[in-house]
Amino acid sequence: MTSVHESAVGTRHSPTPPPDPTHLTGGEALVRALAAHGITQAFGIPGTHNLEIYRHLTAYGLAHIAPRHEQGAGYAADAYARVTGTPGVAITTTGPALLNIAAAVGQAYSDSVPLLVISPGMPLRHPRQSTGLLHEMRSQSEALRNVAAFSHRVSSVAEIGAAVARAFTLFRSERPRPAHIEIPLDLLEATEPAGPVRTAPPAAPRVPDAVRIEEAAALLARAERPALVLGGGARGAGAQCLALAEQLAAPVVTTANGKALVDEDHPLSLGVSLHSPAVQEWLTSRDVVLAVGTELAESDIWTAEPLPLQGELIRVDLDPAQMYAGLPADVPLVGDAAATLDALTVALDLGLALETAVAAGHTVTADPTTAHTETVALKAARDDESRPRDAHWLPYLEAIRGALAPDAVVTSDSAQCCYYGALPHLTLGRRARYLHPTGFGTLGYALPAAIGAKAACPDRQVVALSGDGGLQFSIQELATAAALQQPLAVVVFDNSGYGEIRDEMNARGDAPLAVDHARVDLAALARAYGGHGATAHSPEELAKLLSTALITPAPTLIVVPEESA
């Protein structure tokens, strides 16, 4: 049975320095390598097999937060990484603990989040068959390889630093995705030569070759109906995206992970609208589409079939495989989003692309007025499509928006109130962040992600949005937020069950089964965990409760009953 410290922060121990500083235990070699890469925060749960790691955290300057479940640790570390741009680190013990965090690793893989998961593993000479060891698995690494970019099982203490450097090289120079490092139990406690500290070198931003840049710029210069689609891979390039959109008078639509890259009140912004039939029809009629850092995936367009674009597609992505996945690029630009868009802007500013376009008989003048009018009409069409389904959430979303500072962080769950409601309708500025579990679509993300985001930026407001079904996958993390005295607002739209699945069963003509739950007093449960709980029966009540929750040093769970919304 796993030994767990009950404190949310965990007990900190000062290590006894080894007699020979060149010889370290595997646990200390690991923590030394993390500190050398600038890691100052870890998430995880201490257990019998990982105590040698925990023994050294404080001495090397790593703070630690212990959620109440390993998935919570994974989601918190994921959000920490998304908000800071620094890899999130999560520590588990062996076996069931590692499998518990696997869902969070899969979510980070889907959303291209730099998450490093570290666990002990079976001893080096483990026979890979049942011998009755505590938490025994035949191969943890094989399990994690299915949801991570790689799983690295080290074979010596000296190899630990190299494994950490390998993970940070991935995070810095390739499409960032989660990695797992496994340290065999006998190495974790063994004292061996650790070798020098190895750190991954900084990577220069990758830029496509000049020929490709000029080809793309020429297409954009002669485009009569350009459009931009921005995904999570454009994060960090919001200013370049907006400048290019204004230069081209091109409306901008974002994916869920690209939400608020461009101010959603901007006259050219369509916000998160790829799922809208009206916006899809408009997008397919564009003569040039510039897609930056997006898979153009089913999770954003809500259909398994690729969009039938009639024009030419320019794709900017750090991952070469994306150029031919789903919708193949007519002009593939493999590179860092910000650096690539800078190069495109320079090519357009120099007039080289325009000269090429004029020589080909094309003369186009960007017309912002027409583009602004088009954007207003498309937003109205999108809202008309969804009003029967979404209208009841809108006043509550306006109340939430009114309570938010410009740089607030909003976390959400795979819940109707989020993907139908907040993603398209909660309008945010580009200083804000919206964190959503796209693609893999796990439940229970919002609350632990809010804890990780608040740890990353304690001076920013953090609000979690969820449904009652999703929240109860991780509701125990209210205890973590309460122990940390985090002023979090957790807004829960309560329909007493799994509303989306209930609706799908009804649409199929099936009798709803296993989707209706007895209503739980979630507000009372929040108080039992050490936070505050209340119910909002109107948008006005929600606004009032939020204003208090965001300055109260404890989590506040606000229930909005579905019948009220």
Label for each model-derived stretch:
Residues 82, 232-314, 428-460, 473-476, ...:
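Glycine-rich, anion-gripping cofactor-binding loops and their flanking helix/strand elements
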Residues 2-4, 40-41, 82-119, 143-196, ...:
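Structural signature of the thiamine diphosphate
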Residues 120-163, 256-372, 505:
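Glycine-rich, acidic loop regions that bind phosphate or pyrophosphate groups
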Residues 3-7, 15, 185-211:
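Aromatic-enriched
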Residues 27-30, 35, 45-48, 53-58, ...:
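Active-site diphosphate/adenylate-binding microenvironment
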Residues 2-6, 10-21, 158, 223, ...:
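Phosphate/pyrophosphate-binding active-site segments
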Residues 51-123, 127-135, 247, 283, 288, 293-297, 324-326, 419-497, ...:
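Thiamine diphosphate
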